Regions:
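Short, surface-exposed coil-to-beta transition loops
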Residues: 112-115, 130-131, 140, 145-150, ...
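Surface-exposed loop/turn elements that mediate protein-protein interactions on large endomembrane-trafficking
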Residues: 93, 100-105, 154-166, 208-212
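Bacterial Sec-dependent N-terminal signal peptides
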Residues: 1-30
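Short aromatic loop motif centered on NTY/YTY
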Residues: 161-219
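Mid-length scaffold segments of soluble, non-membrane domains
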Residues: 126-165
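Terminal domain-start segments
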Residues: 27-121
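Structural signature of eukaryotic scaffold interfaces centered on beta-propeller domains
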Residues: 116-125, 179-187
Length: 219
């Protein structure tokens, strides 16, 4: 019986150490604040917590003056009002899994534009990380423009506002430079990335650890 108590005590000590390590990590990790960072995007939500629809509305409102986003902004408003969409687009809004996507034909016959959003709860319990991704499929290849790529926003749970955060500050090496196509997760926590370079193409995975991502080779 004494040996059993010793084993139980050892297990409890290990669990306590793991919890303490996680708490210590949460206390020491801080997201950077930039010197010229004075833009705060207000997120309005009716419930106790914001949903992916609330984040989408905030980002679309913030981006509506950009020519690229005017069509999705108009269709999003019509979708919320349960009206027919005008730009041959299609929305998937998965509130439970915190994911939304908008798919619409591009300018050319084989072009398709995808816009995706999702969010993660950060381990510090103070923030959420929101991703807004644009992917342009040209037949069997991926195209690029100044709008293609994944942009990230850091949401403050108390202030109910979010701000832009640079990809390199959360561990993502690809920031919309046209060499990578992002696929945000509808389920799970990791981002899949298809990278193209010098005629070659391969997949990588951005693994989420509660604060940031790390790049791994896709299985």
């Amino acid at each position: 019986m004494k040996r059993l108590h010793v084993k139980t005590y050892s297990v409890l000590m290990i669990l306590a150490a793991l919890v303490w390590t996680q708490k210590l990590s949460a206390q020491t990790f801080e997201y950077p604040i930039y010197e010229d960072d004075d833009v705060r995007i207000e997120v309005k939500n009716k419930g106790a917590r914001p949903t992916i629809a609330d984040f989408a509305t905030a980002i679309f409102d913030y981006s509506k003056e950009m020519e690229f986003f005017d069509k999705v902004y108009e269709d999003w408003k019509r979708y919320q009002q349960k009206k027919p969409l005008r730009h041959h687009g299609n929305f998937i809004v998965d509130i439970k899994n915190g994911f939304m996507s908008y798919k619409t034909p591009g300018a050319e016959a084989n072009d398709t534009l995808y816009q995706e959003m999702c969010f993660w709860n950060c381990a510090d319990a103070k923030h959420k990380l929101v991703a807004c991704n644009v992917r342009w499929k040209m037949g069997e290849e991926y195209g690029w423009s100044e709008y293609v790529g994944c942009r990230f926003y850091l949401y403050d749970n108390v202030k109910k506002t979010m701000r832009v955060i640079l990809p390199e500050d959360i561990g993502t090496l690809y920031d919309g430079n046209g060499l990578a196509a992002f696929f945000l997760p509808r389920k799970g926590k990791n981002i899949r990335v298809t990278v193209s370079s010098e005629g070659e193409q391969w997949d990588e995975v951005l693994e989420w650890d509660g604060y940031k991502f790390s790049t791994k080779q896709a299985p």
